[in-house]
């Protein structure tokens, strides 16, 4: 038979995804695809997880948070409430690299250009002064960065930024990039298998395409 394509998204349950994987391995004409490309290194869970240690006490012990391409007001409302509560207590600076949005609390917004990120890494940005002697700084991004074509380069730049922040900040433990997952099954979907992205060739060769 001709190719049958199943396009699965992140809201697909793990039970259904595992069943479809069994079909794909058993029948060669059965193809699994995802709607969007995602360049994600799943070798280490810390590459795509929100740190389990990012609880209220850690946020209270910090005086700086860097949000990178994430809008926690809509993408993580519980986290946004924690950050807002901490900011209202005072002595808590929030730097937001991304589009100008209303987070419901004060933050210093700078553009999301990679050139700005590069200047932070090189120490040529005025905001670098805030990293000096900062206390337990928190860095948060989202899984949206993995959809960029330059995601591998971008994540490497973020690791360099974290490394340099650790050199000048005061911290009880080594900092890491916290990744906010936008869908309930983001982690399971990312860790289950690396699916190819659906292409025009799939539409041409398939007798049926099913979106789940």
Locate the predicted segments by residue.
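Catalytic alpha/large subunits of respiratory electron-transfer oxidoreductases
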Residues: 1-212
């Amino acid at each position: 038979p001709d190719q049958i394509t199943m396009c699965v998204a992140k809201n697909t349950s793990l039970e259904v995804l595992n069943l479809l994987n069994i079909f794909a391995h058993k029948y060669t004409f059965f193809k699994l695809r995802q709607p969007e490309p995602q360049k994600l290194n799943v070798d280490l869970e810390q590459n795509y997880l929100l740190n389990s240690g990012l609880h209220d006490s850690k946020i209270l012990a910090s005086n700086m948070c860097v949000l990178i391409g994430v809008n926690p007001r809509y993408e993580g409302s519980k986290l946004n409430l924690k950050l807002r509560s901490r900011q209202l207590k005072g002595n808590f600076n929030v730097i937001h690299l991304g589009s100008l949005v209303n987070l419901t609390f004060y933050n210093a917004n700078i553009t999301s250009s990679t050139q700005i990120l590069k200047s932070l890494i090189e120490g040529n940005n005025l905001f670098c002064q805030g990293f000096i002697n900062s206390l337990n700084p928190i860095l948060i991004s989202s899984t949206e960065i993995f959809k960029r074509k330059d995601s591998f380069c971008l994540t490497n730049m973020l690791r360099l930024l974290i490394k340099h922040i650790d050199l000048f900040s005061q911290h009880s433990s080594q900092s890491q990039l916290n990744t906010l997952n936008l869908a309930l099954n983001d982690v399971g979907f990312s860790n289950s298998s690396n699916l190819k992205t659906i292409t025009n060739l799939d539409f041409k060769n398939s007798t049926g395409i099913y979106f789940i």
